[in-house]
Structures are given as structure tokens and as C-alpha cells.
């Protein structure tokens, strides 16, 4: 049992990725935690009230540790009006948006969620999109909460460690969904795990967790061989029975292959990997002109919601990683965890 | 000893990547082969005469098997004159180019190289850029030459197997230098090895070799765990004493980190991963407008040659993979192979 597993008394070195947008709910997270891996709630798009409801619910379903993931606000100011106008004209239903969440409101939301994590003594809190602010880090650490940061390069991972993270999740280029990259880089900040894990493991003192493209025991063993202490799995949990992902999203993952995904900013303004669909194809030439997160995200919200209601994959965000060729049937969390940890893993 | 190692009586499951452009010469390839791994000559930018010279030379230096890599011509017709004119105006010294190699000349060059491989009974021939033509495959196989194809997706790997390849090299997104992708894909055809290896190993019957971002024994072990029978290493051999790479290229790799590289078409017209430099930065907005290979390559040749002569990294192609943070000193091929196969690898 390594340091990461010891922290949570895990029997499996697996984290279920905190997939926001309604995919991850207490049912999925508790099923994972009850099997000896670390389940996750994703608070990113939840109001504090809804998060509190989910926390209460998960405590009914499991006594085992779980984590809550929080988006760190980027604090980017409103883009120029003409850019907003252009996108409002281009994105279906975007003209319904009358105002955006202010930076202050984003931070209020963030701190209300931190307060809930403290109030309910949640065992672990993970951060995505940026370094968490020092005051939140201090409060959570004082309360004994284990802190998990997300990094896509060694430089980012080192900053996360310096900020007080107890564990750093390394997001490989293979990973589906939003990228956690927060530093400018000279080249591509999306680095394959085969290269990223050993370079980060050598540089950091805290345990690193590998995220991206792994779907079975071979990936888990390879990541541990490369120096990770655990593996974070997204797409493979997304298609589980217990996951609340949209049936069309699940179906698209079951059908898709490894070269069907790409990184796009067209849905949210922040780079994320998803299965290419009509919205991405039709707007490819505008990839570099999207509004920064969360503005683009706010404008595409009604379009995505309508697409969900109509089971229309053309305008949904079909987040998925590069391991999806091997995902061909919906199984249970228990079955998946058995595939991931088929035999004893020596660590 | 697995099937791949048996084919060449190797003691180490390692291929030295065939890096064209003067990096890989008989000295490097023979040093690798003499240590029980598979050395490679890169015929891509050599004339048949120069290739023959290198073949004679390597036979003086080793009795062990080695391979020769051949570029498969893409056969793309000349781009429109106005596009050529635009690039001639933009690329330093490009106005020296009066004519391009014709598609027929490219094929003549290809078949002359195949004839040399047959004449000298070279043990293995690898192909990059496309499926090799059926007549060449047939001739080489009849002569007992082991054929190695390059693929970046499972679909490409399956086509390579179908075409008669005995081994398929899976080029992960981590890999430096030119991408071997040859099929259009819905999303990104650059897939991380962590996802690519198991998906391809499950689909293919012939041995697969992993290429990209690996620099030490952890990467080798992880690749074998994922289902590869061997590992192809580029950047780490490029900086070896025995490599003929430009000293500035070596130095840049020794200094660079994992997020300093990106895929670019600006040097050759074909996507390749290299350390970001001034030429790439200044022309970033033209990435999607480059001429197809080999036309862009022909136009940048004089610029690159002058940059090499002047030790000017701003206009050289600094090909490198994503594992380069860990490469910090020039070592010998023997030292590198000991790092890659530190202990016995059970396969």
C-alpha cells in the first residue's frame, strides 16, 4: 500500500474522475468508494445548495472517503462586447443570455463550496483550472482535508506542491474533458502520460496520480511502473450503469475510436477533449476566437441543454479520452474496478 | 525473449529510431546493433548512392542486424503557383529553388533504395509516411527481409498488418520528428501511447513497438506492460556521443522541457514535433497554409542548411519528443541502453 492509498485506506489505487455537468452524482461516487477506490463529486457546475444536497446524499450511501472537486475561478474579465455579440449570433439560443456571472460571484460560489467541505468534514478536496488561493488551502489543511491539485506539466505540478497540495493529479494529453493547464507554455502543454509521469515523479516529493486514456489493468500497472501512485479514470466510469451521463453520451463513447476525439474550446472557451461532432466541425475555423471561460460556456449552455433534451449528439459536449476504442459495453462500477485491478498490484 | 526480439536475436527490446537528415549514420546505428538492440539507418533524405555508401560502412562496423528506413512517397501533385510564390517570398533563401522533385523521381528514388536493401540482404526495412506499395512488399518478403510499418492509430496499424508488415511501430503523440499518420481521421490522429498501445495490441496479431517520449527503463517496462514487444527511442539516442545530430540540436534538447515542443508543418509541410523556435513562432498563423510534403520541405532546405552552418537554432528543425526534461547530459549508446534496460525485462 503506497502513500496515496494509505491516506484514504484504499484497496485499489484508483480515483474516479470528478466529471462535472451532471455525470458524477452520489450514486456513482459512492459505488466507487464502497469498492475501495476514491469516488468523487464534481461541484463545478453545481450551486452550493445542490452541492450540499449531494453531500448529504452521499453520506447516506457510503462511510468510505470521497473527494469533492472544485473549479478555481480564472477571474478573467468580460471580453469586448463585439466579440460577445458575434458569438451570440453564431450560437443557437445564446441570445437568451442577458448577463454573465461576475468574477466576484464566481469567488463567492468557490468559498461557499469550501465552507461546505469544511462543514461536512469531507476527506479530500481537489482543484481544477488553477492554483487554489492560499487562504482556502490554509483553512482546509488546518481542518485535515487532503488537498489534490491538477497539473498538465511538471512546472505546474511543482507549483501545486509548493502551494501545499498533498497529491497532484497529472493530466496527460490522453485525458477527456477540460484541461487543467494554467500556465502559459512555449509549446504544447498537453503531454502524453508516458513522458509526463516519470518526469513529474522525479521532480515532486508528493504522490502523483496519472489521468488520461487508461481503461484496464494494463494502464494501471503501466502508470504505477512509470512512477504514479494511482490512476484517475474518467471515460470508463462515465459509461458505467451507476453514472448519470446522458445515454447519448454513453452511446457515442461505446461507438467511438481513439482518433475520434480532439481538443476544442468551442463549447466552454477552455480546451477540452471530446468526440468530434457537428458543432465542432462546423465551427472549426473559430477555435482560436472563442471567448474565455466561463463566457463561452455560458453562451453555449442553452444549446447544450436543448440538445440533451432532444437526444441530439450534434450539439452536446461529448467529453471523452483517447482510450475509448476498448469501451464497448456498459458495465457496473464493480466490474470496471475488477478490470482495472485484476490482480494484486505490488506497490 | 518475445517474437520481436527473436526475429533479430536481440538482447534488448529496443529500436533506435531512424532519424533522417544526417542524425543517424552508421556510427550510431552500429553502436546500437553491437549492444544487442536494433540500429537503424534513415534513407529518407539520402540519395541512393549515399545510402549504398552507408550500407557498406555499417557492414564494416557490425555483424549484427540493423534496419533501413524508407520514406514512402506521398505522390502529391505540385501545389498552385500562387501558393508556392507566397512561400518563396516568406522563406529565407527559398527563391534559390528552381524546380521540385517530381512524383516520378520520388518513386524512382524509392525503388532504387529497395533494390539496395535487396542487394545487400539488409535484415529489416521500415516504412514511414504511408503504406508501402504491394510490389515492393512482395519482393522484400520473398527475399526474407523483415518489414516494419509505422502507424499512429489502430486503423492505420491494421492496414499495415494487412499489407504484410511483420512488425508495426505505434507512433504515440509524444514522439518527436515527423508523424507517420497517413489516413484522414475524425479527430486527432496523435494518440498518447498509454491509450494507443493496448488498443492496438488487442487489435493486431503481429508484434507492436511503442515510439514516443520514453527515456529510461520505466518507459520501456510500461510499454511492455501495455502490450508492446519493444520500444523505439529517438531523442535519447539523438543526444548520444555516437549521434551525428547538430551540436546545437543536442544542446537545445539538453536544455528543453516537456512543454517546449509542438507539432508543426512549417518546416516540411508534414506534421512533426520539435522544440518551438523563432521560425515556428513567427509563422504560427500560417500553420494551416503550408505546402504539402515535400514541397514545403524543399523550400525550407536552404534556410535550414544555412542555419546549421551558422549554429543558428532559430531556423533549424529541432525535432524532439516529450520526454526531454530528463535528458540532461550527452552519454554513450552503451550507457543509454543500460539505462533503458537496467534490469532483466520479463517478456
Curated annotation (Swiss-Prot), chains A, B:
Chemical reaction(s) catalysed: 3 propionate 3-nitronate + 3 O2 + H2O = 3 3-oxopropanoate + 2 nitrate + nitrite + H2O2 + 3 H(+)
E.C. numbers: 1.13.12.-
Coiled-coil residues: none
Positions bound to FMN: 69, 171, 176, 213, 232-235
Keyword terms, alphabetized: Detoxification, Flavoprotein, FMN, Monooxygenase, Nucleotide-binding, Oxidoreductase
Cross-referenced CDD domains: NPD_like (cd04730)
GO molecular function: nitronate monooxygenase activity; nucleotide binding
Gene Ontology biological process terms in this record: response to toxic substance
Cofactor annotation comment: Binds 1 FMN per subunit.
Pfam families the record matches: NMO (PF03060)
Obligatory cofactor(s): FMN
UniProt enzyme class: oxidoreductase
Function description: Nitronate monooxygenase that uses molecular oxygen to catalyze the oxidative denitrification of alkyl nitronates. Acts on propionate 3-nitronate (P3N), the presumed physiological substrate. Probably functions in the detoxification of P3N, a metabolic poison produced by plants and fungi as a defense mechanism.
Note: P3N is a potent irreversible inhibitor of the key enzyme succinate dehydrogenase in the Krebs cycle and electron transport chain. P3N has been shown to be a toxic metabolite to bacteria, plants, fungi, mammals or any organism that uses succinate dehydrogenase.
Family: Belongs to the nitronate monooxygenase family. NMO class I subfamily.
Identification of the protein by name: Probable nitronate monooxygenase
Amino acid at each position: 500500500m503506497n502513500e496515496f492509498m494509505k491516506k484514504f485506506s484504499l484497496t485499489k489505487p484508483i480515483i474516479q474522475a470528478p466529471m462535472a455537468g451532471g455525470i458524477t452524482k452520489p450514486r456513482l461516487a459512492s459505488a466507487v468508494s464502497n469498492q475501495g477506490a476514491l469516488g468523487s463529486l464534481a461541484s463545478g457546475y453545481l450551486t452550493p445548495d445542490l452541492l450540499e444536497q449531494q453531500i448529504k446524499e452521499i453520506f447516506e450511501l457510503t462511510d468510505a472517503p470521497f473527494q469533492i472537486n472544485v473549479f478555481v475561478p480564472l477571474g478573467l474579465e468580460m471580453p469586448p462586447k463585439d466579440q460577445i455579440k458575434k458569438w451570440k449570433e453564431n450560437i443557437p439560443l445564446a441570445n437568451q443570455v442577458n448577463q454573465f456571472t461576475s468574477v466576484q460571484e464566481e469567488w463567492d460560489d468557490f468559498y461557499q463550496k469550501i465552507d461546505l467541505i469544511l462543514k461536512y468534514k469531507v476527506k479530500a478536496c481537489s482543484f481544477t483550472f488553477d492554483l487554489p488561493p492560499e487562504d482556502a488551502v490554509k483553512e482546509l489543511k488546518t481542518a485535515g482535508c487532503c488537498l489534490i491539485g491538477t497539473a498538465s506539466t511538471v512546472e505546474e505540478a511543482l507549483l501545486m506542491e509548493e502551494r501545499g497540495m498533498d497529491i497532484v493529479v497529472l493530466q496527460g494529453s490522453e485525458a477527456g474533458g477540460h484541461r487543467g493547464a494554467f500556465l502559459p507554455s512555449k509549446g504544447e502543454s498537453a503531454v502524453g502520460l508516458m513522458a509526463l509521469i516519470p518526469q513529474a515523479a522525479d521532480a515532486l516529493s508528493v504522490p502523483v496520480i496519472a489521468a488520461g486514456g487508461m481503461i484496464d489493468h494494463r494502464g494501471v500497472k503501466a502508470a504505477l511502473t512509470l512512477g504514479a501512485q494511482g490512476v484517475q479514470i474518467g471515460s470508463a466510469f462515465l459509461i458505467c450503469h451507476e453514472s448519470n451521463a446522458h445515454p447519448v453520451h454513453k452511446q457515442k463513447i461505446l461507438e467511438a475510436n481513439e482518433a475520434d476525439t480532439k481538443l476544442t474550446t468551442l463549447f466552454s472557451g477552455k480546451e477540452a477533449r471530446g468526440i468530434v461532432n457537428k458543432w465542432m466541425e462546423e465551427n472549426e475555423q473559430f477555435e482560436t476566437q472563442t471567448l474565455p471561460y466561463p463566457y463561452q460556456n455560458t453562451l453555449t449552455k442553452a444549446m447544450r441543454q436543448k440538445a440533451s433534451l432532444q437526444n441530439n449528439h450534434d450539439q452536446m459536449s461529448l467529453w471523452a479520452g483517447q482510450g475509448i476504442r476498448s469501451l464497448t459495453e456498459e458495465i457496473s462500477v464493480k466490474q470496471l474496478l475488477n478490470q482495472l485491478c485484476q490482480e494484486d498490484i505490488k506497490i
